[in-house]
Amino acid sequence: MLANETNKLLLSSQQEKPNHYTYLKEFRVEQCQSFLQHKCNQHRPFVCFNWHFQNQRRRRPVRKRDGTFNYSADNYCTKYDETTGICPEGDECPYLHRTAGDTERRYHLRYYKTCMCVHDTDSRGYCVKNGLHCAFAHGMQDQRPPVYDIKELETLQNAESTLDSTNALNALDKERNLMNEDPKWQDTNYVLANYKTEPCKRPPRLCRQGYACPQYHNSKDKRRSPRKYKYRSTPCPNVKHGEEWGEPGNCEAGDNCQYCHTRTEQQFHPEIYKSTKCNDVQQAGYCPRSVFCAFAHVEPCSMDDPRENSLSASLANTSLLTRSSAPINIPNTTLSNSINDFNSGSFAVNIPSSSLTYSPTNHANLFNVDAFNYGGSNKLSNSLSATQNDSSLFFPSRIISPGFGDGLSISPSVRISELNTIRDDINSSSVGNSLFENTLNTAKNAFSLQSLQSQNNSDLGRITNELLTKNAQIHKLNGRFEDMACKLKIAELHRDKAKQEAQEWKERYDLAQIQLNLPAELRDLSIQKLKQLQSKLRTDLEEVDKVLYLENAKKCMKCEENNRTVTLEPCNHLSICNTCAESVTECPYCQVPVITTHT
């Protein structure tokens, strides 16, 4: 089984991400051309993508067809000179060269981006320790699987040797996992009290350092225990300047300072610890810091009662709050008042030997005044007139439970004579007359209003047309006025410019006259005139010096006519033009003999 997996690993070519492929193939492989011309602005601090000096040069790692690398990923060359960057065997050396920054090992196919970085990222997404070119992964999306050589693949075939081997894969990651699985570090109170408060006792090469180690390795990594020292969660102004944390030793108060001295002290302060959500968990669903993360990995629980929410939702989605049947004796309500009005005086319901039943299938109200017994025509007429435009007129359908329909149905037990009596009483009363008169008056008023409205519409249309015509004329006049104002401004600018030029020519003429007769007339001038003349001459001289300096910097140092375009070697001075480059033998700037030239 293991042999088959090994063969698959050998035969399959790993597909690299574009960014990873660029770094593996080109990082520090070529020399920086801008540095040769003294134009590279990434030299101090050295963060350039290309190498500047020979000891920074990195060889491109390649896995050969036989399954081996062109140089080892673990064994360093003993003949390589770290100062000059020269190896007697050259690029064919099968061992690692300890270049500046150990780039050959870190950016090797075997190790590049195979382990998670132990340092955080800044606001731009760069590693706070290694910067833009960090060789470790920041997040699961940035991690890549390692490329093994044939020897490691053969080692994988023997499970026992793999378990007992000291060269186990990702040994530092396994050590970190063992640390994370320690029960005491699973307790947040223990982490808050002991994280980074003691120095690490392991050798530097055997410790991942950073957040993965619960002990500190330097002063910037140290954290004062909040049990022993009382300090606030705000940074110390003597240590932190802007976004950068300086040395804690810059604070004269030392450990007795009441402010944070390191980023670790601030993030793991009891007031800030686990108070905000972890970005890695929200974005990638995974946090490489595990139990040593200072940010929260759990969503906050909702404080609302789900039973209350479900009850509110049920009441909102149904008509129980607006259409429920309620007792009719609720005091101080519209429903109660309406019922009291119907139950008092001439509004009493009196249908002997009859009963009303509510049908769930009937949704129409057969009688708008079916429960009224005529007792006083004037009072009923006034009541109907007052409530004619009121949508809240109390009909029986408003007080009946919705479970029994929106209206009333007449039970067969109700005698037809009773209904006829009610109809005759209503027709014989003034209720019908008042309703008819009100309808007639309303129609008459509507007709008169309609004729008046049509007349007003015609007048309004005529006035609107006149206003549109006047507005068009006003816009036209405004356009002409703006054109005239623009022309006037241009004329004023020309006038002012002409005045200024005339004044300058007058001053030049006066100065020329003074210079022509300068020796004879200097003694005749007043002190004020002499001071003005001196100031003018000094200003002109300074301007001449500036122009002369700029022209000398651009023009060829030999002919002083053409611009500089040719760089001389070995001095790398850009000092002559193409015309003079053919005949020059030494640099006109430093007098060094010229070997080659390039543009």
UniProtKB/Swiss-Prot annotation:
The gene is unk. It comes from the Eukaryota. GO terms for molecular function: DNA binding; zinc ion binding. Disruption phenotype: Flies exhibit an 'unkempt' appearance: small rough eyes, held out wings and crossed scutellar bristles. It comes from Drosophila melanogaster (Fruit fly). Keywords: Cytoplasm, Developmental protein, DNA-binding, Metal-binding, Phosphoprotein, Repeat, Zinc, Zinc-finger. Belongs to the unkempt family. The keyword Phosphoprotein applies. CDD domains: RING-HC_UNK-like. This is RING finger protein unkempt. The modification Phosphoserine is found at residue 411. Essential for late larval/early pupal development. GO terms for cellular component: cytoplasm.
